[in-house]
Swiss-Prot record:
Belongs to the TRAFAC class TrmE-Era-EngA-EngB-Septin-like GTPase superfamily. TrmE GTPase family. Keywords: Cytoplasm, GTP-binding, Hydrolase, Magnesium, Metal-binding, Nucleotide-binding, Potassium, tRNA processing. The lineage of its organism: Bacteria, Bacillati, Bacillota, Bacilli, Bacillales. GO terms for molecular function: GTP binding; GTPase activity; metal ion binding. This is tRNA modification GTPase MnmE.
Length: 460
């Protein structure tokens, strides 16, 4: 275990609340807390993994700062594998900041840097780098499924797979090195067969893993989803129905939504960042025109388009132009207002949809919403999100490293097939082995670690 100084930080979100937590970690964590703690027993004398009621006081005046419950956890069975103390004080802004100030006034303790607790857990071997990154994914998860994927990664699901692949590559590399060191055995042809078989299997698994990248990124980052359509077809009603709150103004007046409105929503485990756009149409209103331009920008950057049509009207030229604007994009066509007399040509709608899902709804009565949710989930997850038990790769850094390693193995296989010198094959496999090691942090550089952990919040 590496030697560090003692750090402290607030580990709970700022703001009003019943309880806040100040966390300490390091060789003098218990000693530091004990200096300002007054209770039935000294913290330096209590057993590990116990919690104690007491008060925090100013050392010079013995004035009470706050009542606290103190958790004492001694190394190595802690998150950082160091001595850890958590001070559970009253929530709010003033109380918890005063407790932190009291701790930082003590000698040999400093304010933690962003992500430093997790960084210490990594450097002390408690978790690897992919598990550390999954901690932030868990904090930022917007759906149950995204949380499940993050927890699986924290528990080492991706880590173990990467370790197994690196071990398989290492065995292949070792076979090559035997051939290089003992050329008199003339086993080069056999070694090439081993490379084709073993390295080929690693490449196959990496290819399967990369196939989950699109779905993994959706679960991790969400789908940017633009709701588009002519004015007053029910776009804001759709947003409010999915969010279950009145976020957008719903009136009979065309052009009411004059800007884009964004909201996150969980649709059957798929996180959507819904963007309710202003109706796209030609207008003389300067403010509405600015909203229309933002709508066009949202349309171009969206992962998914929800095109809303008015079933009570015949298709208009504006509707057809919207179909043209989303040509080739992931889209679901929503024919709204099914509770009214239908004037729309559904056959023509299906032709314009060009194989993309068409769902009929009455958002006023919330009819057809279940069908819409199913269409969204099945568009990106053929077997449904909740039913899939698999290892996802969702982190952009991991995806890039896997792509690089896969290409290096491809180069090695090509070299072996072309009967190039076996040591040339070994170089590519060794590079792939090193590249995969960056996922777990086995071969990561310090500059990368500093960059990754700086993205964490204070106290984590």
């Amino acid at each position: 275990m590496m030697e560090f100084d003692t750090i402290a930080a607030i580990s709970t979100p700022m703001g009003e609340g019943a309880i806040a937590i100040v966390r300490l970690s390091g060789p003098k964590a218990v000693e530091t807390a004990d200096r300002v703690y007054r209770g039935a027993n000294r913290l330096t004398d209590v057993p590990t993994h116990t919690i104690h009621y007491g008060k925090l006081v100013e050392q010079t005046t013995e004035q009470v700062v706050d009542e606290v419950m103190v958790s004492v956890m001694r190394a190595p069975k802690t998150f950082t594998r160091e001595d850890v103390v958590e001070l559970n004080c009253h929530g709010g802004i003033v109380a918890v900041n005063r407790v932190l100030e009291l701790i930082l006034e003590q000698p040999d303790v400093r304010l933690a840097e962003p992500g430093e607790f997790t960084k210490r857990a990594f450097l002390n071997g408690r978790i690897d780098l992919s598990q550390a990154e999954a901690v932030m994914d868990l904090i930022r998860a917007k759906t149950d499924r995204a949380m499940t994927v993050a927890v699986g990664q924290i528990e080492g699901r991706l880590s173990k797979l990467v370790q197994d692949l690196r071990e398989q590559l290492l065995q292949t590399i070792a076979s090559i090195e035997v051939n290089i060191d003992y050329p008199e055995y003339d086993a080069e042809e056999m070694t090439q067969q081993i490379v084709q078989k073993d390295a080929g299997e690693v490449r196959r698994i990496l290819t399967e893993l990369l196939a989950t990248a699109r779905q993994g990124k959706i679960l991790r980052e969400g789908l940017s989803t633009a709701i588009i359509g002519r004015p007053n077809v029910g776009k804001s009603s759709l947003l409010n129905t999915l969010v279950q709150e009145a976020k957008a103004i719903v009136t009979d007046i065309a052009g009411t939504t004059r800007d884009t409105i964004e909201e996150y929503v969980n649709v059957r485990g798929v996180p959507l960042k819904l963007i309710d756009t202003a109706g796209i149409r030609e207008t003389e209103d300067i403010v509405e025109r600015m909203g229309v331009e933002k709508s066009r920008q949202a349309l171009n950057s969206a992962d998914l388009i929800l095109l809303v049509l008015n079933g009570n009207d015949a298709l208009t030229e504006e509707d057809v132009l919207l179909f043209e604007a989303i040509r080739g994009m992931n889209a679901i066509i929503i024919v709204n207002k099914s509770d009214l007399t239908q004037a729309i040509d559904l056959t023509r709608v299906s032709e314009l949809a060009d194989g993309r899902p068409v769902v009929t709804t009455s958002l006023l009565e919330e009819a057809g919403v279940t069908d819409l949710e199913a269409a969204i989930a099945s568009l990106f997850f053929e077997q449904g999100v909740e039913g899939q038990d698999m290892t996802y790769v969702s982190n952009a850094r991991h995806i890039q490293l896997i792509k690089q390693a896969s290409q290096m193995i491809e180069d090695a296989l090509g070299a072996a097939e072309a009967s190039m010198p076996i040591d040339m094959v070994q170089i590519d496999l060794r590079r792939a082995w090193d590249t995969l090691g960056e996922i777990n942090g086995d071969t990561a550089q310090d500059s990368l670690l500093d960059k990754l952990f700086s993205q964490f919040c204070l106290g984590k």
